Amino acid sequence: MARKTPLKRYRNIGISAHIDAGKTTTTERVLFYTGVSHKIGEVHDGAATMDWMEQEQERGITITSAATTCFWSGMAKQFDEHRINIIDTPGHVDFTIEVERSMRVLDGACMVYCAVGGVQPQSETVWRQANKYKVPRLAFINKMDRVGADFYRVVEQIKTRLGGKPVPLVIPIGKEDDFEGVVDLVTMKAIYWDEASQGMEYDEREIPAELQEKAEEYREYLVESAAEATEELMNEYLENGELTVDQINSAIRQLTIDNEIIPLLCGTAFKNKGVQKMLDAVIQYLPAPMDVPAIKGILDDKDESEGTREASDEAPFSALAFKIMNDKFVGNLTFVRVYSGVLKQGSSVYNPVKMKRERVGRIVQMMANSQEELQEIRTGDIAALVGMKDVTTGDTLCDEQNVITLERMEFPDPVISLAVEPKTKADQEKMSIALGRLAKEDPSFRVHTDEESGQTIISGMGELHLEILVDRMKREFGVEANIGAPQVAYRETIRNTVEQEGKFVRQTGGRGKFGHVWLRLEPMDPAGDVLYEFKEEVVGGTVPKEFHGAVDKGIQERMKNGVLAGYPIVGVKATLYDGSYHDVDSDELSFKMAGSIAFRKGFMAANPTLLEPVMKVEVETPEDYMGDIMGDLNRRRGMVQGMEDLPGGTKQIRAEVPLAEMFGYATQMRSMSQGRATYSMEFQKYAEIPKSVAEAIISKFNNKDDDE
């Protein structure tokens, strides 16, 4: 089968935003104008096409990133038909992992901002993730028809809060109820969309006289920015003071792909104005798969050297599984992004992470929540494979003769845990299956059994995250569960360097046990990338080489269960530098025990402390409740980092607050502000716990030990 759409006409994009910026409505309009859905689905009435999980439609927020394919040839049919694969990403901070994994497989992104709310905390998180994966992006300032909409304020915030260089391609004609359309700064024409045809038709007119001066000022900035793309353009601009439309467009495209600028558009998706222009910008300025650097990976050779895969159908097949989902009708769906080569239905792929071959049953293309079966997928495609048995998010699938392992995604450790048990004993097995499936879909969700209490513990990125998973268990698997009080994921670490001896000697009739080590323990940054390091500086064979691994193992096992209060230990560098052994009695177990003993004693001598997760909290409140809310944050051991005035007499407070103090905050905040304040929270860092709080946690742990 030949390729239907040339690769240069592919756009793999994500539409990403803060919760209420109107991202789902924007995506709906995209699907409407590109002809996929003939009736526009509104979030208000729970009918949006992309929000296909029941809870999403109920809560009006997007949780999972559904992938959808559509086609666009421009507002005036001025382009050849382009294929746009859209990955819809959630905007709630508890689902940051979803954003992270979709960013990994995108070539470009559309950031949607609310013209009233502007750049919000989640927007900053998404921006950081886009920076991490170097995703070229454009921005769409939505809700221009809302009271308090201010295009120019949001442009300023993108500069100051996100550190981007926004270059408006349009400016709004009117605002709030009087928002009528936009001035296109490239062609210097005013565009008005026709309301009767839901924005399918539009008019081009002369720029309104009152906007002429502003349009010229912003046009000059646009041309100046474009001229910076190359030296030739800059010379031409300095000579003639102008560039042609084609020169501007190709320069803006180059600068966007190089992540130098953020082209900016605006409109109101709800009133069907401006999304059409955004689609044109996706085609004009965002990259095709071959415009971004070739994907890197580790080759399957002796040196595990680094290799790349060019975006070409001729290259060996390589793809990344970025999402696993359960479908009632077809079972397991593995969403993949194809980076190179071709995959046919019924053929086999190799998973180098699991070292397994798997046969591909069916390949389906998702159209929001309907599916179309495909015979093959090629470079640049995003589709779902049915029936993959042992693939997890982040795994590579490739050609067995040309193995490559693409860079894996980094998944954050959970910060909150709950005990969960089925309401009826009969549901125990069903609950285990349900939790296993949910954990396979979502790498930031973990399940384990507490060895002491025998309880099932689930861990995730926030209260809402776990609430929704418990809810899904009930809906999709028919398991009702009781949940316990939330538990915080504390950590233990040390502050000083110590040297410590550890000896394990057992003498019973016959062969005994003998292990003897000296360890140096040094603190490392508990927030760094490396949380534990083991070094060997043994001179003269005082501890034989074959036992070094056992010492390391003994230390790591002790670190898992903590010393101070039973929490995992992080930020320690352990050096084995001396010891002794016995020809007959020494074995691996003896040295494992000696390592564990030395570590435990050394840890307690190295000024140990507890760390707790600290959250970045942003509260937006009417000024009248400001004092109460600030006082409450202080009572919760919060540190206020800054404040900002928002339109309409609203204040924004930014603070860092320990997670342990944030349980039940939503209820408290609502009652203090009569339901008018809103807040968002995301994990910021691990920080040392004040002595009095730490002592309470440690004594609780010691009492539990005494009871047992």
From Swiss-Prot:
Its main location: cytoplasm. Gene3D superfamilies: 3.30.230.10, 3.30.70.240, Elongation Factor G (Translational Gtpase), domain 3 (3.30.70.870), P-loop containing nucleotide triphosphate hydrolases (3.40.50.300), Translation factors (2.40.30.10). Residues 8-290 form the tr-type G domain. GTP binds at residues 17-24, 88-92, 142-145. Keywords: Cytoplasm, Elongation factor, GTP-binding, Nucleotide-binding, Protein biosynthesis. SMART domains: EFG_C, EFG_IV. PANTHER family: RIBOSOME-RELEASING FACTOR 2, MITOCHONDRIAL (PTHR43261:SF1), TRANSLATION ELONGATION FACTOR G-RELATED (PTHR43261). HAMAP family: EF_G_EF_2_B. This is Elongation factor G. It comes from Psychrobacter cryohalolentis (strain ATCC BAA-1226 / DSM 17306 / VKM B-2378 / K5).
